């Protein structure tokens, strides 16, 4: 069941960082938050797999779920999040913002941004309601394209366990533009509405 979360912004557009698959790595989160602050983002959208590294992955560099929780809790009022396949009620107990919804919708100045992890909804199985941009993660492989119905589809990749030979990545949404960048600040792709 989707949570519909609407931000009413009255002509003031927000800048969002969209981040998925941290998997408990404190150094990976710190690098991403350096980009968050450096680019002037105002809201952090977490697409799940926040604290737990998952049994299929090796141990991430700097595994520190409590440190990740502490860093995120300090900015809880600026975070919206959805549940990943590695997130549980135990993880929720450590975090001071909700993470247990499978998806949520942000409406920013009329633009519909769907956030989901990717294990329930993704580019092949979209949520029932339409969106201008669909953000997801889960596969750790970034992608950015416009599909046949004009929806921008963005897999943010992962700052911790990038796959396919990719660098650690995240996404930024700002005033109709989606950008994929590395945690070192290199822009890999952009797409405009």
Walk through the language-model features, giving the residues of each.
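Core catalytic region of metal-dependent phosphoesterases/phosphodiesterases
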Residues: 15-108
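Intrinsically disordered, low-complexity N-terminal regions enriched in serine/proline/glycine
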Residues: 3-4, 35, 172
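Conserved beta-sheet core of the metallophosphoesterase superfamily
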Residues: 101, 109-114, 119-190
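Anion-binding (especially nucleotide phosphate/pyrophosphate-binding) glycine-rich loop
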Residues: 193
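N-terminal amphipathic/basic-hydrophobic helices that include classical n-h-c signal peptides
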Residues: 1-13
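Intrinsic low-complexity/disordered segments
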Residues: 1-3, 20, 114, 135
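Intrinsic structural disorder/low-complexity segments
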Residues: 7-10, 26, 88, 120, ...
